[in-house]
Amino acid sequence: MFRIVNGEDYSPAVQQRNSLDFGKAPSLLWTDHGGSNDRCETGGNGRESGQDRVKRPMNAFIVWSRDQRRKVALENPQMQNSEISKRLGYDWKMLTEAEKQPFFEEAQRLRAMHRDKYPGYKYRPRRKAKRSQKLLPADSSVLCSRMHIEETLYPFTYKDGCAKATRSRMESRLSRSQPTNTASSLLPQEHRSSWTSLSHNRVT
């Protein structure tokens, strides 16, 4: 149900991820995963209400960094949270295994307490809801402009109000172009007739 604490849980990648989580919210100074995405539910009733969500037990890095973060913040009041997190991650990597051991033991104790308090606990990260993509008024005008350009290739493929306007514009263009085409088609015939009559007059 719970993993045994080992060196893999405190690899540089995991430490960097935890340190980045620290920089997201001030509440992370005292908890390991205080963000809404890292809150978990208990395995008792499967509900996900505010009372049922349980935070993960702190790991060794969080146990060590909660005091170190406050110390660094007091010494460097102008330093951003992200910079503090990077510094803490680097400092943690520089510690020896002997220096990290007390924090590993404390993390194990916290895990045991957490397991006793929430025996059916399961870590279930909350998924972010996808935002529905809606067309804004500006997007609609852009779509109409694009249809106006591409209407010769895709005249009736759109199924919104712009399609009707596009179709009416095309029909009006066709109606205007037909007399012009007829007149232009008659020009060569009239031209040939005039040349024929002129040649006939010269022969006679």
Swiss-Prot record:
GO terms for cellular component: cytoplasm; nuclear speck; nucleus. GO terms for molecular function: calmodulin binding; DNA-binding transcription activator activity, RNA polymerase II-specific; RNA polymerase II cis-regulatory region sequence-specific DNA binding. One of its GO terms (biological process) is sex differentiation. Residues 175-187, 194-204 have a biased composition (Polar residues). Pfam families: HMG_box. SMART domains: HMG. Residues 54-122 bind DNA. It is found in: Nucleus speckle; Cytoplasm; Nucleus. CDD domains: HMG-box_SoxA_SRY (cd22034). Keywords: Activator, Calmodulin-binding, Cytoplasm, Differentiation, DNA-binding, Nucleus, Repressor, Sexual differentiation, Transcription, Transcription regulation. Gene3D superfamilies: High mobility group box domain. Residues 32-52, 169-204 are annotated as: Disordered. Interacts with CALM, EP300, HDAC3, KPNB1, ZNF208 isoform KRAB-O, PARP1, SLC9A3R2 and WT1. The interaction with EP300 modulates its DNA-binding activity. The interaction with KPNB1 is sensitive to dissociation by Ran in the GTP-bound form. Interaction with PARP1 impaired its DNA-binding activity. Transcriptional regulator that controls a genetic switch in male development. It is necessary and sufficient for initiating male sex determination by directing the development of supporting cell precursors (pre-Sertoli cells) as Sertoli rather than granulosa cells. Involved in different aspects of gene regulation including promoter activation or repression. Binds to the DNA consensus sequence 5'-[AT]AACAA[AT]-3'. SRY HMG box recognizes DNA by partial intercalation in the minor groove and promotes DNA bending. Also involved in pre-mRNA splicing. Belongs to the SRY family. This is Sex-determining region Y protein. It comes from Megaptera novaeangliae. The lineage of its organism: Eukaryota, Metazoa, Chordata, Craniata, Vertebrata.
